[in-house]
C-alpha cells in the first residue's frame, strides 16, 4: 500500500515528520492544480475524503472530483446527509473521523476486494455524471437563484 496525500494543511509538517519516523509509505504531494489532481485520483485505487471531526462542511467541492475518478471513496466526514449518500448510492464506505484503526480496516477491506472497488467506483462515476457535472449543476443553481429573485 502506498499513500499519496494531495493538498496541504496546517498539520503537514507534523504529519511528514510522523511518516518519516514510522517509515510509512506516505508521499506528500502538496497543492496540485485541477488537472494534476484529477490524474492522481484516476491513478489511485481508493480515494479518501479525509476530514477532521470539527469540520463543518456538508458536501465539499472535491467530492465531485473523487467520484468522477471512478474509484471508491472512503468518507470520514460527519455530515449525516453525505454519510447517508455514501451508503445509499453505494460508492464508498463511511468511517468515523480521527479513528485510524477503523480507517485502516476499511482501506484493507477495499484493498483486498478489487471487484468491490470496481463496483463502487462505477457507482461513484455515475453519481458524478448525474449530480456533480458543473455544466448542469451550475445552471440548476443559477435557475434556482433566478426563481428566488
Segments and roles (model prediction):
Residues 4, 13-38:
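Nucleotide-activated donor-binding/catalytic signature segment of Leloir-type glycosyltransferases, i.e.
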Residues 21, 102, 109, 116-131, ...:
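A short, well-ordered alpha-helix in the C-terminal region of glycosyltransferases
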Residues 41-58, 71:
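Acidic donor-binding loop of glycosyltransferase active sites
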Residues 49-51, 74-78, 95-96:
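Conserved acidic donor-binding loop of glycosyltransferase catalytic domains
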Residues 38, 60-71, 82-84:
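Short alpha-helical segment that forms part of, or immediately flanks, the ligand-binding pocket
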